[in-house]
From Swiss-Prot:
Produces ATP from ADP in the presence of a proton gradient across the membrane. The alpha chain is a regulatory subunit. This is ATP synthase subunit alpha. It catalyses: ATP + H2O + 4 H(+)(in) = ADP + phosphate + 5 H(+)(out). The record marks S373 as: Required for activity. It comes from Mycobacterium tuberculosis (strain ATCC 25618 / H37Rv).
Amino acid sequence: MAELTIPADDIQSAIEEYVSSFTADTSREEVGTVVDAGDGIAHVEGLPSVMTQELLEFPGGILGVALNLDEHSVGAVILGDFENIEEGQQVKRTGEVLSVPVGDGFLGRVVNPLGQPIDGRGDVDSDTRRALELQAPSVVHRQGVKEPLQTGIKAIDAMTPIGRGQRQLIIGDRKTGKTAVCVDTILNQRQNWESGDPKKQVRCVYVAIGQKGTTIAAVRRTLEEGGAMDYTTIVAAAASESAGFKWLAPYTGSAIAQHWMYEGKHVLIIFDDLTKQAEAYRAISLLLRRPPGREAYPGDVFYLHSRLLERCAKLSDDLGGGSLTGLPIIETKANDISAYIPTNVISITDGQCFLETDLFNQGVRPAINVGVSVSRVGGAAQIKAMKEVAGSLRLDLSQYRELEAFAAFASDLDAASKAQLERGARLVELLKQPQSQPMPVEEQVVSIFLGTGGHLDSVPVEDVRRFETELLDHMRASEEEILTEIRDSQKLTEEAADKLTEVIKNFKKGFAATGGGSVVPDEHVEALDEDKLAKEAVKVKKPAPKKKK
């Protein structure tokens, strides 16, 4: 047997050196097991330290969110394809709460509720992430709404104005033009975006919740054709997606928008629509065995929407003065705005525009019911020119609707009532507007001035819209300085109003009604004053009394 030639001291020092330099390549993972799975929900055992809203990793890289933390199991919502999740599979904790990438790289992109691009244009360029469940700005971090957000829709900007940082609910039955109102509002921000002025520019986020794929594609196409995708992000959770995605989509959109708001920028976010999010959350809650409440919704469905919509704010100047304006959409059934979800969201928001089926079917589009629609804070942000010309518009229309119902049964009306009906019919016609044709605010002021100033009283109702269109074309070509003055000063001075009246009078002389008649009103002839009339004394000769015989 050969002798050991290496000294014992060398062996000892080599072992000590190896031990001192050794690092154990081990990691501690908390692993659970799927007990049962189905319908986008999985119950997992063996994760005692998991946090609420924590991300869990299922086999195949599929993610889930821990929602129910029971004594012996965790109820998780699976985000994505849940068909391959089976009983017995291992589930790992990630130690992270749900977050999405944010930044300017999202402009012009279509993403899913996880922030992953689905438009086939490669990865989104982003190096910042934002948690989905961040608190809304506190009271001290906010300031009052004072800047207008122009929608380009006459009926809204005149009667239910929206300010930057406001939450204005768009509510109505299906197929009444709710999405069209919001898309037109996005299109109307194009001029501000092209100005390059950060104080005017408004970034837009459109969140599609449970919409048909064809509807989302049509919205994207409309925005592209209108040049609006340059400043818009679409977060899409189509009808075919899981309930988890529909529940999550609004929070993803608001996280992307909040990032810009805290950078001092102005953002508009549209939730289309929150009814479907509430229904998805109801499905998730029932599958997780949470106790149902009214209409089978869980008890925290109010909190679901309040914590989302409270993120809309006008930040204080110390935080950059950015704003996030929200236009949530709610779909009603049979015009019932007193149902559970509609009343919840009405109480959370700062006003609502109610779109009515009957008005829509009568051809009044946008079909806004003036009597029920209101804006609680936007009036402070309305420009002075619009306040001056539209001050009596709401009252005039409300009285017209009331008188219209009465006139259906009355056989004879007095002259004042007839005049009110005539003007009301012209105002209704004036407020009609084609889809995807938002109007600049200075042209809206001229248009409303026509109606409330009585300049359309001599124009036949069927010619009102043609008269308005041709007058605005004439002013763009020959009277641009009046429009520019209104746009820059945001006021309608007495001098500008006189000029505008003169332009309208001159334009009427060359405008021919459909029947070929003139629209120039007849000159008003004033009655002569009684003092100016020559007084004539009339003497009456009485016959002499007969003598008595």
